[in-house]
């Protein structure tokens, strides 16, 4: 029986994780859950999984949750302290880090410090403080299992192989909803257009990141740290069918790939049960039903955010933190109708231009850098034309 904590249990990854847990009650016990402000869903999860501890966004929500629970009541925490309490809960063997954005950095680091293995769905943690987090992983001798479908595919394609034999990593990307839209129409796309992903069902923020391909840029940076591979050996291929989730090319010319229908339950289950595999309910892949698998290079004119991610990696380790923070603010501004779609990348570029990259010595320095970039981006979005 593996005891798990889920940070972000009411989000897309959290819900899928609990579906995997429900399918295998003999394997998993839920110790702690954290959520933002979706109390209705959290109440249902508490009733079903009876965690020892939960945490919500604020004290007000914690009081409201406590009053609304008719039966079983776990310990109720709130805020950053609540996230840390859940992440370090003594009974947990593994923490699923599924909080969206840089907000996941502090509790994920706390889980690692507490000696917990981590199933990492929060790519922003490694984008914001990659070297520091990986140093912590090695120091505490814990395992970091990738949950992102692309990184899970790379992880699986490297199993049993020597890292010195890896020539390059090839991350695949669907291209999102605007892959074939004429470039001159990108400035006019609506929020609903951007949220209409062709292949994956995800949260709002990551869906916008997929439309700009910033999501793939974040994944390039995450792969750099997860697999200790320099950016020049991490390529991105557009693969509209989303069947091959990523590939690894070796020095002998062999290419290992992981295939499957687009469903996050598969990589989640592998992270939870590694090195075993369990049934997930994911539909089987019928290759004969596919008309073909296509691949091509991304166009930086269409996806400038992807180029910004490579630029951030090249600039130095504080720059990805700045890029990520600016992106989070810009996406929030777009989803609020404050700026247009093409203004997202333009906002990020402006904030990156205003930052002089430097080495990050501590998690706190990474957080300070993150806060600086957010403040600058918030100032800027009020000046960007809609």
Curated annotation (Swiss-Prot):
Q: Name one GO molecular function term.
A: NADPH binding
Cofactor names from the entry are: Mg(2+); Mn(2+)
Listed binding positions for Mn(2+) are 148, 150, 219
Query: Does the keyword NADP feature in the UniProt annotation?
Result: yes
Which pathway does the database say it acts in? Answer: Isoprenoid biosynthesis; isopentenyl diphosphate biosynthesis via DXP pathway; isopentenyl diphosphate from 1-deoxy-D-xylulose 5-phosphate: step 1/6
Q: What class of enzyme is it?
A: oxidoreductase
Catalytic activity as recorded in UniProt? 2-C-methyl-D-erythritol 4-phosphate + NADP(+) = 1-deoxy-D-xylulose 5-phosphate + NADPH + H(+)
Q: Which residues bind NADPH?
A: 10-13, 36, 38, 122, 124, 203
Q: What is its EC number?
A: 1.1.1.267
| UniProt GO BP | isopentenyl diphosphate biosynthetic process, methylerythritol 4-phosphate pathway involved in terpenoid biosynthetic process
Q: Which InterPro entries match?
A: DXP_reductoisomerase, DXP_reductoisomerase_C, DXP_reductoisomerase_N, DXPR_C, DXPR_C_sf, NAD(P)-bd_dom_sf
- Keyword entries, A-Z: Isoprene biosynthesis, Manganese, Metal-binding, NADP, Oxidoreductase
Q: What SUPFAM superfamilies does this protein's entry cite?
A: 1-deoxy-D-xylulose-5-phosphate reductoisomerase, C-terminal domain, Glyceraldehyde-3-phosphate dehydrogenase-like, C-terminal domain, NAD(P)-binding Rossmann-fold domains
User: Does this UniProt record's set of keywords contain Signal?
Assistant: no
**Where does the chain bind 1-deoxy-D-xylulose 5-phosphate?**
123, 149-150, 174, 197, 210, 215-216, 219
PANTHER family in the record: 1-DEOXY-D-XYLULOSE 5-PHOSPHATE REDUCTOISOMERASE, 1-DEOXY-D-XYLULOSE 5-PHOSPHATE REDUCTOISOMERASE, CHLOROPLASTIC
Role: Catalyzes the NADPH-dependent rearrangement and reduction of 1-deoxy-D-xylulose-5-phosphate (DXP) to 2-C-methyl-D-erythritol 4-phosphate (MEP).
Sequence similarity: Belongs to the DXR family.
Q: State what protein this is by name.
A: 1-deoxy-D-xylulose 5-phosphate reductoisomerase
Species per Swiss-Prot/TrEMBL record: Geobacter sulfurreducens (strain ATCC 51573 / DSM 12127 / PCA)
List the gene name: dxr
